[in-house]
Design a protein with these regions (language model features):
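N-terminal basic, low-complexity leaders that serve as flexible interaction/assembly modules and, when applicable
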Residues: 1-91
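Active-site-proximal, glycine-rich beta->alpha crossover segments in alpha/beta enzymes
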Residues: 81-184
Length: 184
């Protein structure tokens, strides 16, 4: 507690993460692209325009009063940087449409791992900084990432499932690359 009678949502989240008793379960709405609808914006606008994203996130915070909230829920950010094609729609996050490793059982060079300057990452990180400034004292902010297997399936396509039987070492190497992506 912070010396006040009531703890902030952020404090509640951190208490939960420390496996300490809490007075209630934390409220963490994964608003995703629904956040855009709250301000009259499409999913595409929310996921490609920083001003729209921040405006939508602030509206989620005002309306739902969450203890914590993700800044962006787009599991294709890393895949896009690594060469996957995306299909965009105005009512949902983008979908991966092409898989750069579909025709080759290679593991990309670690020199291609996304950085803070890659793709849409600068926009997301800037939105995170702005949200931290606006609500970060009271609301826990979450940064989401694409997990290693999901990213491997984005890169390789459906062949990843046969690869698990046909070439376990390749899958382990590819998952290692994808885990490094998540760690970065």
């Amino acid at each position: 507690m912070n010396g006040r009678l009531h703890m902030t949502g952020k404090e509640l989240i951190f208490q939960t993460l420390r496996h300490e008793p809490t007075p209630r379960a934390p409220w963490v709405p994964f608003a995703g692209v629904h956040a855009g609808a709250l301000v009259g914006a499409t999913a595409t606008q929310v996921l490609t325009d920083e001003e729209t994203l921040v405006r939508a996130l602030l509206e989620v915070n005002r309306l739902y009063k969450p203890d914590g909230q993700p800044v962006v829920f787009d599991l294709q950010l890393e895949a896009e940087v690594l060469g996957c094609g995306l299909v965009w729609a105005d009512d949902c996050p983008p979908s991966v449409s092409s898989h750069p490793l579909a025709d080759t059982m290679t593991v990309p060079c670690r020199c291609t791992l996304p950085t803070a300057e890659s793709g849409r990452m600068p926009m997301v990180l800037s939105a995170m900084r702005r949200m931290k400034e606006a609500v970060g004292d009271t609301t826990a902010l979450y940064g989401l990432l694409c997990g290693p297997f999901t990213l491997a399936s984005h890169l390789r396509g459906n062949d990843i499932f046969m690869d698990m039987f046909d070439d376990e070492d390749y899958v382990k190497d590819l998952l290692g690359f994808c885990a490094d992506c998540a760690k970065r």
